[in-house]
UniProtKB/Swiss-Prot annotation:
Monooxygenase involved in the biosynthesis of limonoids triterpene natural products such as azadirachtin, an antifeedant widely used as bioinsecticide, and possessing many medicinal applications including anti-tumoral, anti-malarial, anti-rheumatic, antibacterial, anti-inflammatory, anti-pyretic and diuretic effects. Catalyzes the conversion of (21S)-21-acetoxyl-apo-melianone to (21S)-21-acetyl-1-hydroxy-apo-melianone. It comes from Melia azedarach (Chinaberry tree). Its EC number is 1.14.14.-. Belongs to the cytochrome P450 family. The chain crosses the membrane at residues 4-24. Its main location: membrane. This is (21S)-21-acetyl-1-hydroxy-apo-melianone synthase CYP88A164. GO terms for cellular component: endoplasmic reticulum; membrane. The keyword Iron applies. Keywords: Heme, Iron, Membrane, Metal-binding, Oxidoreductase, Transmembrane, Transmembrane helix. GO terms for molecular function: ent-kaurenoic acid monooxygenase activity; heme binding; iron ion binding. PANTHER family: CYTOCHROME P450 26, CYTOCHROME P450 88D6. One of its GO terms (biological process) is sterol metabolic process.
Length: 490
């Protein structure tokens, strides 16, 4: 009798677990199916995951296990290779897009799609009124604010500043009698560059203060859930964001005062331009909006340059024949310089054809930003599927760049794959695409090129752990920050 009762209790427990598990596992699907009604029949294939957390566990599991593509290849296996899938990720019902033509369509459709960052990013970055301005007003402000960093002519004025910081930083690294964390030092150097360009300041105290809080801020940008409680990365990031505002707002007041007293004397930064920009009603941006933009620019500007330049140098040193080819190109560029030319020039930058391929291949294989984010402002038809109004769209860079159908042997570092490669919209999207493509792409590539140029000409990387594993969160990086000796070439 006792044994029968035990089995009955066990059966009830197991049965209850199975029923509850099955119900909870399908709850999101049922909820959105009822909410959308007949439209749900036209959603792409996929899985809405668990209530609240959606599919964040398998998404981050791949990154933590060192196989970030596993999430996407699991979608391929379950739902076919169409490249458009429904999902629930970063707290929102979403459509994941990794078909190049579909990516191109979304990027170009600025009328039906707006920026659609996760809630954590929005709360950390956009605290002012810029996001509530009209779409036309946003376009105008964005165009005016980013004009100083678009195109070769505009970015040429920053070369001397970048070159000075690069040369001094590398001399300092090579002079140390112990190994350095190469990536960490690159981040410090690129932060100096971006702070100088955007804030118009080379003050070590200002740069140090901003960088101190920036790290915690950046770690919370893609928090799975925006939980503002002690112990969560998002909470720490919110506190860091508050401190960044407290540091930057006095800089705005100081720059405004310097302008009124005519004390800038050519030392203008992007911050000065932002203080002059007016919206469609003739209203100037509030300080909180300017701080929002400065933090966004600082984030995008220094992270991409530091990591991609570091990875490019690492990959080249892992492939001696590529390193030799890249170094020879830099030596030939120096030989061709006019006798009157001192230092790097925009013409040198234009001649760096192989380094441009190295940078593009590093962008492709590294995927510093895994996704571009949009939000549908109306029901949109995308290759026969519906994207419901209000749903997020993740244009999954990593899924495009690591798909063997788009790039044969995608895990191999091979700059030659860019030889005479035709421009195929939607296939290469490290900076996004369409009207909202990253405005700092030109400046970032210039900065990376100058770092790589001077490093290859004068230094050699000697990693202490050549087989060091890669960590993928929050961004791909060597787990030891590329602990290495920087050796000056004779």
């Amino acid at each position: 009798m006792g044994s029968d009762l035990l089995w009955l209790i066990l059966a009830i427990v197991v049965g209850t677990y199975v029923v509850l598990f099955g119900f909870l596992r399908r709850a999101n699907e049922w909820y959105y199916s009822m909410k959308l009604g007949d439209k749900s029949r036209y959603l792409p294939p996929g899985d809405m995951g668990w209530p609240i957390i959606g599919n964040m566990i398998p998404y981050f599991k791949g990154f933590r296990s060192g196989e970030p593509e596993s999430f996407i290849f699991d979608l391929f296996e379950k739902y076919g290779r169409k490249g458009i899938y429904r999902n629930h990720i970063f707290g929102s019902p979403s459509i994941i897009v990794l078909a190049p033509e579909a990516c191109r369509q979304v990027f170009l459709d600025d009328d039906n799609f707006k920026m659609g960052y996760p809630e954590s990013t929005n709360k950390l970055t956009f605290r002012g009124s810029f996001n509530t301005a009209s779409k036309e007003g946003q376009r105008r402000i964005r165009k005016l604010a980013t004009s100083p960093i678009r195109g070769h002519k505009a970015i040429a004025i920053y070369i001397d500043n970048i070159e000075d910081i690069v040369v001094k930083s590398m001399n300092e690294w090579a002079s140390k009698d112990k190994p350095i964390e190469f990536l960490s030092e690159m981040r410090k150097a690129t932060f100096k560059v971006i702070a100088n360009i955007f804030l118009g300041s080379s003050s070590e105290s200002v740069i140090g203060s901003v960088e101190q809080y920036y790290v915690d801020y950046a770690n919370g940008l893609i928090s799975p859930l925006a939980i503002n409680l002690p112990g969560f990365a998002f909470h720490k990031a919110m506190k860091a964001r508050d401190m960044l505002g407290e540091i930057l707002e006095p800089i705005l007041r100081e720059r405004r005062s310097m302008k009124e007293k005519d004390q800038l004397k050519g030392k203008r930064g992007l911050v000065d331009l932002l203080m002059e920009v007016e919206d469609e009603n003739g209203e100037k941006l509030e300080d909180v909006d300017i701080v929002d933009m400065l933090i966004a620019f600082l984030s995008a500007g220094h992270e991409s340059s530091a990591h991609i330049a570091t990875w490019a140098i690492i990959h080249l040193h892992r492939h001696p024949e590529m390193l030799q080819k890249a170094r020879k190109e830099q030596e030939e560029i120096v030989k061709k310089r006019p006798a009157s030319q001192q230092g790097f020039s925009i013409e040198d930058f234009k001649q760096m054809e192989y380094i441009a391929q190295v940078i593009d291949e590093t962008l492709r294989i590294t995927n510093l930003s895994s996704s571009s984010f949009r939000e549908a402002e109306a029901d949109v038809n995308l290759q026969g599927y519906i994207i419901p109004k209000g749903w997020k769209v993740l244009l999954y860079n990593r899924g495009v760049h690591r798909n063997p159908e788009n790039y044969p042997n995608p895990k191999e570092f091979d700059p030659s794959r860019w030889d005479n490669r035709a421009n195929r919209p939607g296939y290469f999207i490290p900076f996004g695409g369409g009207p909202r493509i990253c405005p700092g792409a030109d400046l970032a590539k210039l900065e990376m090129s100058i770092f790589i140029h001077y490093f290859l000409l004068n230094y050699r990387l000697e990693p202490l752990n050549p087989e060091c594993p890669t960590e993928y969160l929050p961004v791909p990086r060597p787990s030891d920050q590329c602990l290495a000796r920087i050796v000056k070439l004779k």
